[in-house]
Amino acid sequence: MKTVLVTRPKHQAAPFVRELEQYGLSTVVFPTIEIRPVAGWNVPDLTKFAGIFFTSPNSVQFFLKHLLQTAPDELKNLQQTRVWAVGKTTGQDLEKHGVSIEPLPKIADAVNLMADIDPAEIKGQTFLFVRGSLSLGTIPELIAEFGGTCVELTVYENLPPSLEDTQRVKDMLAEGKLDCLSFTSPSTAKNFFEAIGSKELSDSVQIAAIGTTTSGALEKMGIKVDIIPEYFDGPSFAKAIAEALK
């Protein structure tokens, strides 16, 4: 039985583990990032924005939870505002709350999302970008390039966890007990290799990235990526890993 290391945050690992196990794969959960809500922010008047951008399920989860607790009337304004999402899961999480989203890009990353938008729709307008503490600045940069204004709202923090099982994972790598390392964000990859080091890798271990943003971050670290799914979501990621490990 092939074994996959899962580096997702603890609260998000279970669904992905189930998907991998459905393909007969064994898993080792080693969260390399911890997600926490940011305190002390207020939900802005959403009618002031020409559109709102969400680039992860976490941004949707923490934004909507706080909105429903502190400013539930703003949900109607959100439902009446143009909303863009990166990734199928991000879009689905918004739609569960009655929020209509603009068409998803074929390749689920910020660059391709912005490439699908006519710059004329951006120029002179103000947009809201709901983000995490380590989210990339691609969307604000491109909005500014197109002549628009972007207000950034950080609703969650990406923090490195304590990584108590570091030695165990090092030992498993050294003993050839891990067949694939899976990464779902640049942060999961960065924290993993800071803790473990790339010297521990053997050629037999396959590296899987959920999308182009994560694969790009890995490649910048000098790590060759073997597996990228056709669609950048959990089920497609699990399927791609299973097919590669046959």
Swiss-Prot record:
GO biological process: protoporphyrinogen IX biosynthetic process; uroporphyrinogen III biosynthetic process
Alphabetical list of InterPro entries matching this protein: 4pyrrol_syn_uPrphyn_synt_sf, 4pyrrol_synth_uPrphyn_synth, UROS/Hem4
Pathway(s) where this gene product acts: Porphyrin-containing compound metabolism; protoporphyrin-IX biosynthesis; coproporphyrinogen-III from 5-aminolevulinate: step 3/4
UniProt entry keywords in alphabetical sequence: Lyase, Porphyrin biosynthesis
Transcription regulation listed as a keyword: no
Top-tier EC class: lyase
EC code: 4.2.1.75
Catalytic activity: hydroxymethylbilane = uroporphyrinogen III + H2O
An example Gene Ontology molecular-function term: uroporphyrinogen-III synthase activity
Gene3D superfamilies: 3.40.50.10090
Cystine bridges: none
Domain of life: Bacteria
One matching Pfam family: HEM4
Purpose of the protein: Catalyzes cyclization of the linear tetrapyrrole, hydroxymethylbilane, to the macrocyclic uroporphyrinogen III.
PANTHER family referenced in this protein's UniProt entry, alphabetically: UROPORPHYRINOGEN-III SYNTHASE, CHLOROPLASTIC
Assigned protein family: Belongs to the uroporphyrinogen-III synthase family.
Protein's name in the database: Uroporphyrinogen-III synthase
Organism the protein comes from: Chlorobaculum parvum (strain DSM 263 / NCIMB 8327)
